[in-house]
Amino acid sequence: MERTFIAIKPDGVQRGLVGEILQRFERRGFKLVGLKLMQVSEALAQKHYAEHKERPFFGGLVAFITSSPVVAVVLEGKGVVATARAMMGVTNPLNSPLGTIRGDYGIDIGRNIIHGSDSLESAEREIALWFAPAELLEWQATLGSWVYE
């Protein structure tokens, strides 16, 4: 079964949106297999955003993600990478439709509430970066037959 990495960023944590965001994914039928509240180190932030290292906004990304706690999440389910991205909306909240997480709660591109892996390859890399294997729980959800054919 497919897995993805989600980070509820400092603005989402500070605004008390963690429960609402997790609820959306659970109601969609995705299973939580990893969940932790953490203070992101500068080293982890730099590794996570390494692809943006040469961009002018890199320092701001690192400063923001390390400024306050983040909720790191691993979700599992059929098509979870693409579906989670659709549920989040586009990067700029002002261009995200209402009904998406960013469309409903975001105001500014620099405070867009949530990060989600953009591909299976990114998901694997990000999950390995943010979680030790022992932090991911293998468990059987009984709702599977009610969600998938």
Curated annotation (Swiss-Prot):
- Supply the Pfam families for this chain: NDK
UniProt entry keywords in alphabetical sequence: ATP-binding, Cytoplasm, Kinase, Magnesium, Metal-binding, Nucleotide metabolism, Nucleotide-binding, Phosphoprotein, Transferase
Q: Which domain of life is it from?
A: Bacteria
Among CDD domains, the record links this protein to: NDPk_I
Which GO BP annotation is one of this protein's?
Answer: GTP biosynthetic process
Name the cofactor(s): Mg(2+)
Positions annotated as active site in the UniProt record = H115 (pros-phosphohistidine intermediate)
The record's listing under InterPro entries reads: NDK-like_dom, NDK-like_dom_sf, Nucleoside_diP_kinase, Nucleoside_diP_kinase_AS
Q: Name one GO molecular function term.
A: nucleoside diphosphate kinase activity
Q: What is its EC number?
A: 2.7.4.6
- In this chain, ATP is annotated as bound at K9, F57, R85, T91, R102, N112
Intrachain disulfide bonds: none
GO cellular component assignments: cytoplasm
Localization recorded for this chain is: Cytoplasm
Q: Which top-level enzyme class is recorded in the Swiss-Prot or TrEMBL entry? A: transferase
Reaction catalysis annotation: a 2'-deoxyribonucleoside 5'-diphosphate + ATP = a 2'-deoxyribonucleoside 5'-triphosphate + ADP; a ribonucleoside 5'-diphosphate + ATP = a ribonucleoside 5'-triphosphate + ADP
The family note in this entry says: Belongs to the NDK family.
How it assembles, according to the record, is: Homotetramer.
Cross-referenced PANTHER family: NUCLEOSIDE DIPHOSPHATE KINASE (PTHR11349)
Query: What exactly does this protein do?
Result: Major role in the synthesis of nucleoside triphosphates other than ATP. The ATP gamma phosphate is transferred to the NDP beta phosphate via a ping-pong mechanism, using a phosphorylated active-site intermediate.
State the protein's name: Nucleoside diphosphate kinase
Q: What organism is listed for this UniProt entry? A: Gloeobacter violaceus (strain ATCC 29082 / PCC 7421)
Q: Which gene encodes it?
A: ndk
